[in-house]
Amino acid sequence: DVWCAHCVHLSPDDLADFADSDTGVAHCPTSNLRLGAGVAPVRDYVESGIRVGLGVDGTASNERGDLLHEVKQALLVARGRDGPGALTARGALRLGTRGGASVLGRDDLGSLEPGKRADLAIWRTDGLELGGAADLVAGLVLSAPHRVDRLVVEGEDVVRGGALVRADEADIARAHRAQAQRFAT
């Protein structure tokens, strides 16, 4: 039940140790790139049998809390490092859903199946951004960012029509900025 974040400098022996010990990796591609920390060999992780999920790493090293953006970054970084066959859009999305659940040891989430917990993020696919997309999953991943149209958590709407239902977004943003400034000083 151990997982490590980033893991951009693992040796082949480390990969074997992670796989043998069932240690997971939280891949944070945007943070790794922003900090110049290195490029995670995600394809090597997956081929070695290591559980891999995605993380946003927080606003100290990534100004976004957008997991779909991390899905896109994971796809682009993997392809930039290992070529076009390194990861598909669906494979990258899997890292952000089932992969994250697996890394956390949570088989009760990560996919839509009877008996599992189901938080849902729904994006519109009928706008100009995806008008020419032959594959809506690839289009959604590669043309990110998208504002979520509906977000359901534990069966309750949190976002509807792209707007927060039970909170004021401007108030949250102000409080977040103030807290981030306190941490920065």
Model-derived segments and spans:
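Structural motif corresponding to alpha-helix initiation and N-cap regions
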Residues: 11-12, 36-39, 86, 106-109, ...
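Active-site core of metal-dependent hydrolases
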Residues: 1-64
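Flexible loop residues that form catalytic
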Residues: 7-8, 79, 126, 156
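Active-site microenvironment of metallo-dependent hydrolases
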Residues: 94-185
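Short Asp/Glu-rich motifs
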Residues: 37, 64-65, 134, 170
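Short, conserved sequence motifs enriched in acidic/basic residues, glycine, and aromatics
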Residues: 9, 86, 163-166
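His/Asp/Glu-enriched, well-ordered alpha-helical/loop segment
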Residues: 43-127, 141-143
